[in-house]
């Protein structure tokens, strides 16, 4: 997904 990085199973870090 553009501009989005996913870490682990439930953790989400949104990078703009």
From Swiss-Prot:
GO biological process: adaptive immune response
Highest rank taxon of the organism: Eukaryota
Designated name of the protein: T cell receptor beta joining 2-2
Organism the protein comes from: Homo sapiens
Main location: membrane
Annotated localization: Cell membrane
Keywords (A to Z) from UniProt: Adaptive immunity, Cell membrane, Immunity, Membrane, Receptor, T cell receptor
Function: J region of the variable domain of T cell receptor (TR) beta chain that participates in the antigen recognition. Alpha-beta T cell receptors are antigen specific receptors which are essential to the immune response and are present on the cell surface of T lymphocytes. Recognize peptide-major histocompatibility (MH) (pMH) complexes that are displayed by antigen presenting cells (APC), a prerequisite for efficient T cell adaptive immunity against pathogens.
Gene name for this UniProt entry: TRBJ2-2
């Amino acid at each position: 997904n553009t501009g989005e990085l996913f870490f682990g199973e439930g953790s989400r870090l949104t990078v703009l």
